[in-house]
Amino acid sequence: PKPSSAASDVYKRQIMCKGMNRSLANVIFGAVGSETSSAGSTQQEMNIKSYSTTEAAMILDAAEKIIIVPGYGLAVAQAQHVAREVADTLEAQGKKVLYAIHPVAGRMPGHMNVLLAEANVSYDVLKDLDEINPEFEDCDVALILGANDVVNPAARHDESSPIYGMPILNVDKSRTVIINKRSMNPGFAGVQNELFGYDNSIMVFGDAKDMLNDLLKEIKEL
């Protein structure tokens, strides 16, 4: 039976706690209590760069190694099939394409694996957190599709953040990070993501499925 949203949320937090070595109560109530101090002023300070799908396609065209990072936004948009089409098209152009799978991306453990299996993505290119993190060091483009907390660098260094200590995907180590989100709203943990304002990050706003369909057309035309 499919777990309820509330049950899977608690299970997800338990997994987060394991990685963070913190109590469940600390994470649940810590996120609520810290939201204003961690997220309140950050957005004003961040230098958000909004790009079009045409510009994103040009960046991907120049790349040789691309890592796709699926998240909850991909699931909501049911964009897994077009994500695979984009990956297949890039691979046909001679590029190396991998998928970075965080254990708690989405709304339940294994959510991304299930979605990508539905789209017949080869298991060989699905890499878990420990396996993929060293790959970001020489990655030309990390393409973030609706993932948020699991790519927030604050988890590594900001002790005031409710997600501090949570293992994350080190996408910020890539040369360029293309982030697709519907809006600037915070993720599951309720904190703003400092990655969005990094010098090597660009935002492509919109529904993941619509954005990827546009991106696919642009890539094919280049």
Question: Can you say where each PLM-predicted feature lies in the sequence?
Answer:
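Single conserved hydrophobic/aromatic residue that forms the stacking wall/gate
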Residues: 1-7, 11
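Structured cytosolic domains appended to multi-pass membrane proteins
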Residues: 44-222
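Alpha-helical transmembrane segments of polytopic integral membrane proteins
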Residues: 13-17
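Conformationally flexible catalytic loops at phosphate/diphosphate-handling active centers
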Residues: 20-48
